[in-house]
Amino acid sequence: MLLLKAKKAIIENLSEVSSTQAETDWDMSTPTIITNTSKSERTAYSKIGVIPSVNLYSSTLTSFCKLYHPLTLNQTQPQTGTLRLLPHEKPLILQDLSNYVKLLTSQNVCHDTEANTEYNAAVQTQKTSMECPTYLELRQFVINLSSFLNGCYVKRSTHIEPFQLQLILHTFYFLISIKSPESTNRLFDIFKEYFGLREMDPDMLQIFKQKASIFLIPRRHGKTWIVVAIISMLLTSVENIHVGYVAHQKHVANSVFTEIINTLQKWFPSRYIDIKKENGTIIYKSPDKKPSTLMCATCFNKNSIRGQTFNLLYIDEANFIKKDSLPAILGFMLQKDAKLIFISSVNSGDRATSFLFNLKNASEKMLNIVNYICPDHKDDFSLQDSLISCPCYKLYIPTYITIDETIKNTTNLFLDGAFTTELMGDMSGISKSNMHKVISEMAITQFDLCRADTTKPEITQCLNSTMYIYIDPAYTNNSEASGTGIGAILTFKNNSSKCIIVGMEHYFLKDLTGTATYQIASCACSLIRASLVLYPHIQCVHVAVEGNSSQDSAVAISTLINECSPIKVYFIHYKDKTTTMQWPIYMLGAEKSIAFESFIYAINSGTISASQSIISNTIKLSFDPISYLIEQIRSIRCYPLRDGSHTYCAKKRTVSDDVLVAVVMAYFFATSNKHIFKPLNST
């Protein structure tokens, strides 16, 4: 750190040296250093001399040369717009130090004719590269586009967003690969300095050579805006380039077509522009250059692009493109010198059309997503209504975008979940029913790992003597469909809101006979007997048998359990409104949502746990019962209803929720303390 008293003197000295030191050109006519080493251990470096080959592995040499002789100096003037004056502040060297360094290097110059020849050849190669027509053409495109975006295209805009720069890079570097295949890697390295990519690994640059790139970007971010600018500068700067543009609607294609025409006519001579409105084509021909073309089409006229030759094909709002148009578009993948660039916003209205997100698992990294939510905090974002940014990232918002809590609430009132998808760019959370995950992964991990050892006396003596069992019967032998789910819960004496899952069953009937109720009741009784072995302090069991499927069968199950149970069993009863009779069954209704909400809260807060000695006669033989339950817990989703309420479900094509419902309802009855359980013979 500089001392305050020395700061003024240092500033004065720097000003004096800056004013007296003249800018000198980088002289490559004679070598500065020629090393006295064997030919196999040296290399000719065009900007310095003949140096030991080991220096090529050091970034210091490259950094030094680019600092004092950057490629971006002395650039040609742009054809339109204002040239960006890049700041270039190289360290100033005192004259005495400069003289001393020159003295040292002059003493170490070895007069080697062969080495001089090697150096001159390296210098000539460097000059040839810098005078190559392809390099000059591509450099002119970069300068033109940079200058055009520097307050020319839009007066108040001089900067572009990171995703817009990435779109430019995918376009530009693919141009290099098709314009100069033999010099692709060398030109890749040269243009790294133009885009500020000096530190990027060369292997990473190969991504830009992909045949297809996909960009998923939220609404109103300037997707089409930057495409118009890129295409306009491509036509005017690069000869013999053929560009295609496909939109999902005719008016969008016409709008882009008109905007490009207006841009070209405003900033470039009209005599170079040939417009063919009947087929949406623009031909731009500069003097002494081959013409470049643009064709704008829509997905409704898919045959218009068949038979065409495109080097770059931009597919705008690709998620909304008609599916029968995709074969005509994807056919250009076979063309060796063609690249497809899919650009789209998220289609939250229809998951079936959001096909671009399927490429997230592609072997090539071709999917680029602008998203304000990271995968690790997606759950937090869905659970907290007031959250408008990712908890771990500083939310970068473009100046022309507004994201706040009011916008979020209003947008979601129109379409639930639209804020997350349309505005925040989150694709992975889309579903047909706009479902949201409600249990965090951290809570599930804690539930799985932190299991109580209920065989220890100090734990057992803290448990109540009443066990709660819920039975969700299924009268089918189809193992691919629903089975009978049974859940058993014990609560703590000192805190009835805390409980332990001690048993669960998922029972499937072997065949459809008249003994279905007996088999289900026997399964429940086996669970009760096994519980008494581990927990002999249990004095009674409170049972709820769901009767939604068949009330008669549910009554039969309750009766059989009452007869076969080794201890007292109390049942919840349902009162018949017509006969005032009470049946030992439970009719599941609106309380299901309340039960799920209390269970979700218990999992997230850690007030429910599982026993290490979980009882299961049907699951444990092939699967860990708790892992079996966790698989269903992960599938819990909340469905919003039209009346503003919510319902919960965990059913999936490959996962049923029978065991989960039984455990959830058993927990609900064990902790709610508002239901009456009575003996079967009670009136």
UniProtKB/Swiss-Prot annotation:
GO cellular component, one term: host cell nucleus
Keywords, alphabetical: DNA-binding, Host nucleus, Hydrolase, Viral genome packaging, Viral release from host cell
EC id: 3.1.-.-
Primary site of residence: host cell
Intervals of motif Walker A motif: 217-224
Pfam families linked to this entry: DNA_pack_C, DNA_pack_N
List of catalytic residues: E317, D472, E546, D658
Motif window: Walker B motif: 312-317
Function (record text): Component of the molecular motor that translocates viral genomic DNA in empty capsid during DNA packaging. Forms a tripartite terminase complex together with TRM1 and TRM2 in the host cytoplasm. Once the complex reaches the host nucleus, it interacts with the capsid portal vertex. This portal forms a ring in which genomic DNA is translocated into the capsid. TRM3 carries an RNase H-like nuclease activity that plays an important role for the cleavage of concatemeric viral DNA into unit length genomes.
Name of the protein in question: Tripartite terminase subunit 3
Organism: Saimiriine herpesvirus 2 (strain 11)
